[in-house]
């Protein structure tokens, strides 16, 4: 009997006892290829000696120092590294313990920025439907995942949502990417004008949409148009790269591929690679200057901000990525993953879309390719795929509610940056078998 309140109360999980490279091992000795990086976290895989050595060394030196009393070498060095590699205009870093905390801090930072510069009437946040920004209340309110939000709506602050930039589901037949980008971005301007530009704090978006919709990249020029609209009305652009950032898409920051810089950016998962809980908010010089010239104080904080062991781990992770040229591997293995997925599923009668960037790929399942009709949500196809994949020693990240929080199924893939061709091929082979087995169980009406 477990004393843990697990995510799923019914059922028994295997006990993980070890990990090495791209594999996790359970107590029965079974190996699982971690093709999802957990939740797009384990960018270096498991048991990397450089990272564990850095953790050990920092623990021997200093395990904890509260940020109201001290800064630390580990935090200062990591901040320098992050800004050195940051998008243009980013000047400072605020450390937290994970993605939801990062989004909460970013929201408060954006609000306080306008208070500091004398625009305290700004109170509205705009985000996108079918987005996910975290499970704490502010982040949950900002996200557009209805399944996650529904029972907690009475507790959520008012936020406003527009449609996502989701070509497979929203681009009209015959509509060019340029026309679709313009139409999708126009929704933001319309919403700003509806609310009143003087009342809007920020627009929040995942650069590449993650778990909720399954690695959905924007069409070309969408974010350039979004950036221009935000600038036109003095609205801050907050990019959430908690899942898609820190190398996952083949560049350190996903927005590099869209040719823009945000005002504020959140990062987490790939920052520490799962070796320690850590996230961060990157902020532009203008945000910092408003605080510095105003109250000189950011009214926010948590006990474990800038935790030295977490910062040391993240610094080691980022050092390995840079030293070993792993972004190049993400690009080349990402191309192979896309090719192999196309080979296996390109003509599959129940795969509607294969999408993503780098080692961040989504496969959307449909009942009918021609109409894009989804499977009955009651069939829980995504859960069946996960079960079949685990049985085959493969960890993937399937989700339901791809379209509206209820309908749709997809599988998210986010393997470690260290994968090679053989591992990529094995991932796709096992996934193909798992998908076919799950579909057969649906057809056979097996529970």
Predicted segments, located by residue:
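Conserved N-terminal phosphate-binding loop of PLP-dependent enzymes in the Aspartate aminotransferase
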Residues: 1-447
């Amino acid at each position: 009997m477990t004393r843990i309140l697990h995510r799923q109360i019914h059922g028994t999980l295997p006990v993980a006892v070890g990990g090495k490279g791209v594999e996790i091992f359970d107590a029965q000795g079974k190996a699982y290829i971690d093709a999802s990086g957990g939740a797009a976290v384990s960018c270096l895989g498991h048991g990397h000696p450089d990272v564990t050595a850095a953790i050990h060394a920092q623990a021997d030196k200093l395990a904890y120092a509260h940020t109201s009393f001290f800064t630390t070498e580990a935090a200062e060095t990591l901040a320098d590294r992050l800004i050195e590699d940051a998008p243009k205009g980013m000047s400072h870093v605020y450390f937290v313990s994970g993605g939801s905390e990062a989004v909460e801090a970013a929201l408060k930072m954006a609000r306080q920025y306008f208070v500091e510069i004398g625009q305290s009437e700004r109170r509205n946040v705009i985000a996108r439907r079918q987005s996910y920004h975290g499970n704490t209340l502010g982040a949950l309110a900002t996200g557009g995942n209805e399944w996650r939000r529904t029972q907690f709506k009475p507790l959520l602050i008012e936020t406003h949502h527009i449609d996502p930039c989701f070509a497979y589901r929203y681009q009209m037949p015959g509509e060019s990417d340029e026309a679709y980008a313009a139409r999708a971005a126009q929704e933001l301007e319309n919403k700003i004008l509806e609310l009143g530009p003087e009342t809007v704090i920020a627009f929040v978006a995942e650069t590449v949409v993650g778990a909720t919709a399954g690695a959905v990249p924007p069409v070309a020029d969408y974010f350039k148009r979004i950036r221009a609209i935000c600038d036109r009305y003095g609205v801050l652009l907050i990019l959430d790269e908690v899942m898609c950032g820190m190398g996952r898409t083949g560049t350190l920051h996903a927005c590099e591929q869209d040719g823009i810089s945000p005002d504020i950016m959140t990062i987490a998962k790939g920052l520490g690679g799962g070796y320690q809980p850590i996230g961060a908010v990157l902020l532009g010089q203008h945000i910092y200057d408003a605080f510095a010239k105003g109250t000189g104080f950011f009214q926010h904080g948590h006990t474990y901000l800038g935790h030295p062991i977490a910062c040391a781990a993240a610094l080691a992770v980022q050092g390995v990525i840079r030293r070993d040229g792993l972004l190049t591997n993400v690009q080349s293995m990402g191309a192979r993953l896309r090719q192999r997925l196309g080979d296996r599923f390109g003509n599959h009668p129940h795969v509607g879309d294969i999408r993503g960037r780098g080692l961040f790929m989504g496969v959307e399942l449909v009942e009918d390719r021609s109409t894009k009709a989804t499977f009955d949500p009651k069939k829980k196809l995504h859960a069946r795929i996960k079960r079949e994949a685990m049985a085959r020693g493969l960890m993937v990240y399937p989700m339901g509610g791809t379209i509206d929080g209820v309908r749709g199924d997809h599988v998210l893939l986010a393997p470690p940056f260290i994968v090679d061709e053989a591992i990529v091929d094995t991932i796709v082979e096992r996934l193909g078998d798992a998908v076919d087995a799950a579909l057969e169980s649906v057809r056979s009406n097996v529970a």
